[in-house]
């Protein structure tokens, strides 16, 4: 789902809000700053406080909310505001890795980390062209209707499905 942002941010903001390269660069800088704060500061504080499982649920929901907010933003200032829940969703990834590691024998850690890396690689191969095509489909001249936020709706939907799957799996299988 996050590939909706990674592969379409520049196209979306230029198309929807008529941003220029400087504005796109500023927004990407802010994303980098927010991600750095979440990854470098917030995770160390919040994940131990609420636990990894809740961090997964909350993080995935925040990603979902951020995606849907991006999709339906009507003003540039909204995009900057909506970066907050989206970037806060970054608490989910490290928590998910921690939960997976906690539930695997030490002798299987390398294998499970390899599986996780492979899944991330597969999504990095499939996600960008898929999301770019969705953007194209809803913005080209003969589109059935114009909706540049479509990749974010798809990304948000995928994040929501991930949240439900995580909840069902962790509720049934998590030992801690």
Predicted regions and their residues:
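Helix-to-loop junctions at the C-terminal end of transmembrane segments
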Residues: 38-52, 135
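Structural signature of the two symmetry-related core transmembrane helices
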Residues: 54-69
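Short amphipathic helix-loop junctions that connect adjacent transmembrane helices
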Residues: 7-24
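Intracellular juxtamembrane helix-capping segments at the cytosolic ends
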Residues: 91-105
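Helix-loop junctions at membrane interfaces in 12-TM secondary transporters
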Residues: 69-83, 92
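A membrane-interface helix-boundary motif in multi-pass transporters
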Residues: 133-159
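Loop-to-transmembrane helix entry/capping segments in MFS-fold secondary transporters
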Residues: 21-22, 104-118, 145-148
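Multi-pass alpha-helical transporter architecture, strongest
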Residues: 153-176
């Amino acid at each position: 789902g996050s590939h909706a942002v990674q592969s379409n941010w520049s196209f979306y903001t230029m198309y929807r809000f008529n941003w220029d390269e400087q504005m796109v660069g500023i927004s990407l800088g802010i994303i980098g700053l927010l991600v750095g704060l979440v990854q470098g500061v917030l995770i160390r504080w919040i994940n131990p406080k609420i636990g990894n499982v809740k961090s997964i649920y909350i993080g995935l929901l925040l990603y979902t909310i951020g995606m849907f907010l991006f999709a339906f933003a009507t003003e540039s200032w909204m995009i900057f505001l909506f970066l907050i829940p989206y970037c806060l969703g970054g608490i989910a990834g490290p928590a998910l890795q921690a939960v997976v590691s906690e539930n695997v024998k030490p002798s299987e850690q390398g294998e499970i980390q390899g599986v996780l890396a492979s899944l991330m690689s597969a999504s990095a191969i499939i996600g960008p062209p898929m999301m770019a095509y969705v953007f194209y489909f809803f913005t080209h001249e003969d589109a059935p209707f114009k909706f540049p936020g479509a990749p974010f709706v798809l990304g948000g939907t995928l994040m929501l499905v991930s949240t439900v799957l995580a909840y069902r799996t962790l509720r049934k299988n998590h030992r801690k």
